[in-house]
């Protein structure tokens, strides 16, 4: 066993979810590569007399189920796991896929039913709102290949980004959180992007290893009908096993009224037609992890890229709620660092970030070189 899993598990149990004696914790592994970490979590949970429960989801089994399932089958599957989740006080989810096409062959209709009757019910409505939870990936050959690294190189990267000094990050985030809570108008200008919206009255929140590992973001949400202009994202993103590039959204009064994506505009619109809320924004956040520099086409890493922000169609964050409701929550990232084209972010007409660097004195501790 990689002994770095002991430190990671300690951070998960004591920092991320603050697990207590007699609490039920569901350790869910999606893909068998994550079992080594799951076993360490179960071991340490038992030491403090918590009650761990293990659920292993095999991607191939899930794929075959969805291909053959009726709508009623998916609804029953969701109801069953919803009842299990209701009994949990804590949750750790470990994902270890082996392919970009884990759900290849599942129709868009089935994926939408799965998102609506399983993901939304079990995770968005129950797990997110009623448990202490954290989700993370597990380092394997798949992630190493996506990162253009050897497995050992990726493991070193992984444990660096996961075991960053979150206490230092937490302190450095406070001035940004305070500024966001005082801000009305946000204006973002970058190649293919001229976007404005209000965040007035929407609470900002710091994320420093509590819900995601790796972590590092400060997030809020636009006032629902305030988003106007257009944005072109400069990272690849995956949703429902489809990889999208060069996504552009055009907004009028908060609604995405026009979309394009390289060779995938039809599929993009199908996702945004999931429900009425899918065409409105549910999160605006800065990525701040000093060790995450480039996209992996994996949201859990990409949304933490330093010098980036994400603007998220779909369900609003509970902590920064603008009232938007949807079965989707899709974090799509735009990197503002100079090598990615640069860009500027203004708060109430004051420049706060240029080319991925905070320029206000009170925010400079959040720049990557100061968080390492």
Predicted regions and their residues:
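Internal helix-turn-beta structural module
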Residues: 296-371
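Short, glycine-/Ser/Thr-/acidic-enriched flexible segments
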Residues: 32-33, 97-99, 140, 202, ...
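Active-site bordering "gate/hinge" segments
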Residues: 1-228, 366-371
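Active-site lining segments that contact anionic ligands and/or coordinate catalytic metals
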Residues: 228, 244-246, 253, 279-283, ...
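Dual-mode signal for accessory low-complexity, basic/Gly-rich regions
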Residues: 258-325
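Short aromatic-centered micro-motifs
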Residues: 188, 250, 345
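Long, well-ordered mid-to-C-terminal structural blocks that present hydrophobic/aromatic surfaces
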Residues: 225-270
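Short solvent-exposed loop/turn micro-motifs enriched in small/polar/acidic residues
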Residues: 10, 179-181, 224, 240-243, ...
